[in-house]
């Protein structure tokens, strides 16, 4: 892999920025398609909303990375915190901040939050999958050494090389990209069936949290935080638990409401 596409003067054009931008762009395109297919006219808001959540998500992803993953470095390099083009974005923080921004946007425009979220959820994970290619090209979010003669060898300009040298590393970013695409397929499959509002989004949170929790055992770019677990694993456990409880709550209510409707519709 290569970090740089070219240099314009002394300014580097990084593959990280290109693939990160492509993740946002193609995520918005997919969201537009899904919402237009849904037929409720919400697709007209995609690009305005996309700009909003992209901006807020970048801020959230950066702050999450700085304070939960790399504070040991950044507390001595505070001026580098805004340098997002160098890499260092936490997906979990980006998604959380983006969801908060999206909630207020949808409320302002009187768009039902849960149906909208369910419809665009596959686009979110699709954008994440492309974003992991950015991490791979940049040599961050890397795995720890495999301890064998197989694995990924990163260029000497990357953080992965500066951390572990010329040791083969587990392809953590590649596995997450592949896992995201599998989750995308499962979400599209689930959307084909009748289900309670909000459960598609909850399913996304649960599946991604599980994927992230187990992949963190292979990550080598930061250490454990508590109980032998990393910060992303603790966040994943909390996210999975909350999403599961909400999924069950929504599903039970949906079944109860459906039963009432069927009962009221029976001839007497």
Protein language model features and the residues they cover:
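A feature for loop-to-transmembrane-helix boundaries and adjacent hydrophobic helices
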Residues: 1-268
């Amino acid at each position: 892999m290569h970090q740089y596409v070219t240099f314009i003067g002394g300014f580097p054009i990084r593959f990280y920025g290109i693939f990160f931008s492509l993740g946002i762009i193609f995520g918005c395109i997919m969201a537009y398609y899904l919402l237009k297919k849904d037929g409720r006219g919400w697709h007209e808001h995609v690009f305005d909303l996309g700009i909003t959540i992209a901006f807020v998500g970048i801020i959230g992803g950066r702050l999450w990375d700085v304070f939960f993953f790399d504070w040991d470095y950044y507390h001595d390099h505070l001026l580098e915190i805004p340098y997002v083009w160098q890499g260092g974005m936490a997906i979990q923080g980006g998604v959380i901040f983006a969801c908060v921004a999206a909630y207020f946007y949808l409320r302002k425009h009187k768009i039902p939050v849960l149906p909208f979220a369910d419809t665009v959820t596959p686009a979110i994970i699709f954008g994440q999958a492309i974003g992991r290619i950015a991490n791979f090209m940049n040599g961050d979010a890397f795995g720890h050494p495999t301890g064998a003669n197989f694995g990924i060898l990163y260029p000497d300009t990357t953080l992965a090389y500066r951390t572990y040298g010329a040791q083969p590393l587990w392809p953590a970013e590649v596995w997450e990209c592949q896992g995201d695409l599998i989750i995308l397929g499962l979400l599209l499959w689930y959307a084909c069936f009748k289900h309670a509002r909000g459960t598609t989004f909850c399913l996304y949170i649960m599946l991604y949290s599980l994927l992230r929790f187990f992949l963190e055992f292979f990550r080598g770019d930061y250490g454990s935080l508590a109980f032998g677990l990393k910060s992303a694993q603790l966040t994943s456990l909390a996210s999975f638990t909350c999403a599961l409880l909400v999924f069950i709550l929504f599903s039970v209510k949906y079944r109860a409401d459906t039963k009432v409707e069927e009962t009221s519709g029976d001839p007497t």
